[in-house]
Amino acid sequence: MTERLLRYFRDKQQDVQSEKTYDTQCPFCSMQCKMQLVEQTIVTRKKYTAIGIDNPTTQGRLCIKGMNAHQHALNSSRITRPLLKKNGEFMPVSWEEALNHIKDQVTMIQTEHGHDAMAVYGSASITNEEAYLLGKFARVGLQTKYIDYNGRLCMSAAATAANQTFGADRGLTNPLSDIPHTRVIILAGTNIAECQPTIMPYFEKAKENGAYFIAIDPRETATTKIADLHLKIKPGTDAALANGLVKIIIDEQLINEDFIQSRTNGFEELKQHTDSLDLNDIAEQTSVSLVDIRKAAVKFAKETSGMLFTARGIEQQTDGTAAVKGFLNMVLITGKIGKPYSGYGAITGQGNGQGAREHGQKADQLPGYRSIENEEHRAHIAKVWGIHQDELPRKGVSAYEMMEKINDGDIKGLFLMCSNPAVSSPNANLVKKALRRLTFFVAIDLFISETAKYADVILPASSYLEDEGTMTNVEGRVTLREASRPCPGEAKHDWQIICDLASALGKGRYFSYTSAEDIFNELREASRGGIADYSGISYGRLRREGGIHWPCPESDHPGTGRLFTESFAHPDQKAALSVIPNEPPVPKEKPTADYPLYLTTGRVMSHYLTGVQTRKSAALAARHFESFMEIHPQTAATYNIEDRVLVKIESPRGSITVRSKLSEQIRKDTVFVPIHWADAQNVNDLIGEALDPACKMPGFKVCAVRIIPI
């Protein structure tokens, strides 16, 4: 009898009493994989299962992060009511009290110090509608010039390089479906297998079809394993390597003369520059043998088709823009763009890293990828917004420079949405000091993050399960993510929060939207005629078609999967070749007697950005529950460091403590630390404040450090 009862109760615990399905897409990387979350109620508990859904980009694939994304969205530590700091403690309050307090504080600051005493810090993880609205809120609601976003720390070098070279910036110039058919692929500073795993089947298919892979990375990674040739470069020397590759292609007459003559400018200047370079010097500077540099250059040039992919490895440097432009020189002089199976891809890191940089939350930008300093562009947006052109503020400063202005006392108040600069910024100790200096700080987030804890008010935002709007993936394909689950407690859609803030500040007439679709329809008009033209895209089309590449200027336009087939986006329709110095204009830190090792940073598969979301996921956190320092065994031996012991890492900015991980996959002069942890494990406490002069990207990938066993 007892055994039968136990069996009965065990079986009962497996009975599904009810089941709900939520259609959504992954909130993490730029592939934006479509999925369903299945919620099963079993007695008194709930069980969740994520299922990949077939779509044009990833054909139903999910990675480990996507499979477990719901764990942070459903986490009990979610903020579900507005929080107001009273006597140093956060207390739940009504929306009315929170908004009235915000109105009073913002009014006081701007009355005393002017409109530009307030600033806005955005995110590349929010929807296109929210990015658009945040830019409008800064410039119309607050009338401040100070707005930028965390994508400045992620995509700004690649975006600036593409704009300067091609006249337009889109993650991929050609569709992902080209990858399996191309003949040669360069992966420069990208660890796709861990950062965007659902792209890897495209590369694996290319490998099966005989493509030759060249990887450029100071580490051996899951991605470099696919390579036929791995250039294990010294950190920070990517621009010099690009020059060496270009020089060999020119010197050995492997260029596409017809393409250069008809579709580019600047070749003679480029050739004069490369003529002055010494390949032996480049080999020594980069620590890559001349034999391997030549092998890579010749292979890329001689194949009939080829693709170049870059990511943060070469972009997050103080000459990241120049390094990317150097590699784009190679694409252009071989004519490998604007035709099938050839092109360039900047592998976008954040979920909406593409769309978020197109529609106005950047310091120098207006919607549609327009410039805030261009009078025609200003007039167009002012008309859409119903304001006078002169009311539009001018250009502001970059994300890190905003923090410097806060620290200097020029900016008194801050609105921050879905970002964590106390962890993600370089010289993070200065950022934390700056946040403490703010007169007033409002954070809009899911959790009390390492940054939000400094806020005076925290407003509860929506997760990917509850939020609604469009996202633009790595190939420039706009997709629709509809709200499938109600917000918990008193949390609201992010766009609703922005509208409520504008209304509280007396600007509600400019923000009278009733849905994300309302906002998107205005965004379409704002983008009309711009580089990133969404005017022909509608929610109805996205529901029917599953995604549309921009530019899409008409409702019957199919979208543009391949860019630059006949012309580039500069006024003369030609691409610009660039002269790139081997040494950057802003000197990079190099090892010294006091700080004898290079530090470089990056990601691991189970975590995302600063880890605020993934550290809330039990399944993901269990895979990597703490940070680590990857170090070569021979280097470790010189410091008497064994595997999995605590080590202090110091730079001129600060110190952190992490656990050692001995690995022969890294250079002997370099250590690697991932970016996903905070406090005593926050590697960005070590990173310098120097910025790329072209795009204001910090130099995350190169830092001089010393290590001390504990």
From Swiss-Prot:
Inducers of expression: Positively regulated by TnrA under nitrogen-limited conditions.
Pfam families in alphabetical order: Molybdop_Fe4S4, Molybdopterin, Molydop_binding
Family: Belongs to the prokaryotic molybdopterin-containing oxidoreductase family.
UniProt key word Zinc: no
Binding positions ([4Fe-4S] cluster): C26, C29, C33, C63
Organism: Bacillus subtilis (strain 168)
Biological process (GO), any one: denitrification pathway
Protein known as: Assimilatory nitrate reductase catalytic subunit
Domain of life: Bacteria
